[in-house]
């Protein structure tokens, strides 16, 4: 019976997988000098004229007809037959059996003959291509080392210091330590005090938007009393009071959710390995390193003080194992997992438990353990030496930490202005003439969008970032911390500009609370960026310029093009509308336009990357490249000289 791979009754027992397919003629007598095949077959560029279906009737050469047949032994006959059947099977290209193959099909050009290698061969590639009749480009094999292998997007390391635990006290407010940040309880009460006074809250009306989370007595609001706990941040002596209540609406600030994420990120990034058995982890997804996981994994790396192989049954230990344990000076690690602080937090917050007293106990244990590693220098030593200042943290993890810290600041000083931002006053009269009414809608680029811009433009500590139309300052602050760049923003509307100033102060205090190293050279300005005195100077320094011009009128985009003529060579412009017209080709009539010095590429942004719509869209990255225009001018001069 014929199958896809040939005659099944004649197949050998063992299976050999191949990474390339080949077509070979029937073996001729080994004595022939015209076609010896000593040793393993070698690659050839010769395409065989016949397929495997015609191997049965392959005629012998003329010289072979006159040669008397020699009588091979039965073993050599068997070996020759097995080799012939092996070649027939390995040379299969998906098609019908040979008996039905037409001569026209047999004359088709076939791929180059390659060396047939088994799956166990060290040089073999994946056998997935064995069923594909199309020739494939050979894969470039890289050295299997962590240095030479290209990491996946987001898996690269940051490569710079992002933690500065020893410098956080330098950023308190007027020497008062940690009195300068807006607390969680102020947001819940809607009564922001101090330098951020007038945060747009409703005072006592805000409390009606919250309800108790824990059902036990003493965990509900009683007049002005709000159930709360104090949590210690990584910075020494920095505590924040979190209200143990939840909002009735998803649009409101959620203190319980923020508290849980605060603890999760601290346990994930700040706890030394020597103390992780005390703190534990609050990872949202399945943690393969968590001993509670019932799923075994090859990716789990044992800790240095753990057993490489699982211990035997304690009820009947083997004599050899018992001898090894008694011979060592340190006791064997316990097979019973101790309950960590994270376990208590997870249990107390479980929807089917909501155990308030247990949660308070867990937070007390956490504060005591965190204070201990702060005071004895363990935490600082781990951040400075163990993590090398955070140089080894992955880009994806670093971006998530930045996103959360900045979201804390946004919730405290910008969230209260949400109504004013959605219904902000119109533009000043002198500006409204140049801007259409549809542009009078406030919108923000989300964190994921700015992370992509940082990656594409390669923003770094030596870069200068300028945001024209910076809103509440989200992108400016993200570039200053996530990329470490000097960042400057310019916003026309008064309400977003005021929120930006508040957010800069709150964000920098949050950096200190989390012991993060951001670039403190951040400025946000209010005014028309076309006439602001600082814009020209910052544009001449800029490496990356961001402008959300999706709804700008053509007149404003023309003004921007004139301003961008001062950008230095290699500077990048990120915009939501292109500055190079579609199908633009340089000629004598347009060689003096701004588009003539740009190299522009189009990219996609995804759903929820912008605040004003939930759909995907396009954005553009243009690079200042004056060499194209210079070459065009030289070619024009050459043509003019030839005409003379």
From Swiss-Prot:
UniProt entry keywords in alphabetical sequence: Chromatin regulator, Methyltransferase, Nucleus, Repeat, S-adenosyl-L-methionine, Transcription, Transcription regulation, Transferase
Binding site for S-adenosyl-L-methionine: 442-445, 465-474, 491, 528-529
Reactions listed under catalytic activity: L-lysyl(79)-[histone H3] + 3 S-adenosyl-L-methionine = N(6),N(6),N(6)-trimethyl-L-lysyl(79)-[histone H3] + 3 S-adenosyl-L-homocysteine + 3 H(+)
Pfam families: DOT1
Biased segments, Polar residues type: 93-103
Enzyme class: transferase
Known EC number: 2.1.1.360
Single Gene Ontology BP annotation: DNA damage checkpoint signaling
SUPFAM superfamilies the UniProt entry points to: S-adenosyl-L-methionine-dependent methyltransferases
Activity regulation comment: Ubiquitination of histone H2B to form H2BK123ub1 is required for efficient DOT1 methyltransferase activity on histone H3.
Additional comment: In contrast to other lysine histone methyltransferases, it does not contain a SET domain, suggesting the existence of another mechanism for methylation of lysine residues of histones.
Function: Histone methyltransferase that specifically trimethylates histone H3 to form H3K79me3. This methylation is required for telomere silencing and for the pachytene checkpoint during the meiotic cell cycle by allowing the recruitment of RAD9 to double strand breaks. Nucleosomes are preferred as substrate compared to free histone.
Name of the protein in question: Histone-lysine N-methyltransferase, H3 lysine-79 specific
Source organism (scientific name): Cryptococcus neoformans var. neoformans serotype D (strain JEC21 / ATCC MYA-565)
